[in-house]
Amino acid sequence: MADLSAFPITRKWPAKDPSVIQLYSLPTPNGQKASIALEELGLAYEAHRVGLDDANVKSPEFLSLNPNNKIPAIIDPDGPDGQPIGLFESGAILIYLAEKTGRLLGETPADRYHAIQWVMWQMGGLGPMLGQLGFFVKFAGAEIEDPRPRERYINEAKRLLKVLDTSLEGRDWIIGEFSIADIAICPWLNGLAFYEALDLVGWGDLKNVPAYLERFYNRPAAERGRNIPPM
């Protein structure tokens, strides 16, 4: 049986079966990426609920695995060369799991780079912009008197959604076949409803994106993974 004692996080969130991947997460947009990927790939794993409060994400145990105090994070007891590996950052986790299994990165070397390209687009653009949009639209409210930040993130969200909408023309998935790029993108699109921002970003004017998101969550693995571990 694998020995995960070198990972202090297992003292706060003990592994019932240390031979399988350990997921530390919540079903936020970033958290869903990891759980949906694990479900799509059929990998055995345990999900540990990590609250977003300081007692959890800023605990010494969690910081030992992710010093950036964000979910998700994983430990794979069967990492490179058969040695355990801990990882944080949802994009890195997606790429790792895809490379571990040889799946969800397309059929050709070019497909692989296109999938990674769109993961980076989500990590560097769509996720940060929609996250800030959600803060200023749903949470900040009247406390922010200056309208410019809110307008900036609305406009940038519209721009990014147009990029995605155009790129989806004539295809079901962003690189043509289903990949980790779609797993990176769709949970953030889904967050727009939670942020009550669909009308603000012109969701109804998009030709391809709404059907793309519906298609994504119609996948059984995506439907299962969207609420793991339960809130």
Task: Show which residues each predicted segment covers.
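Residue-level detector of family-conserved "landmark" positions at structurally sensitive sites
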Residues: 48, 226-227
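GST-like fold's C-terminal all-alpha helical module
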Residues: 118-218
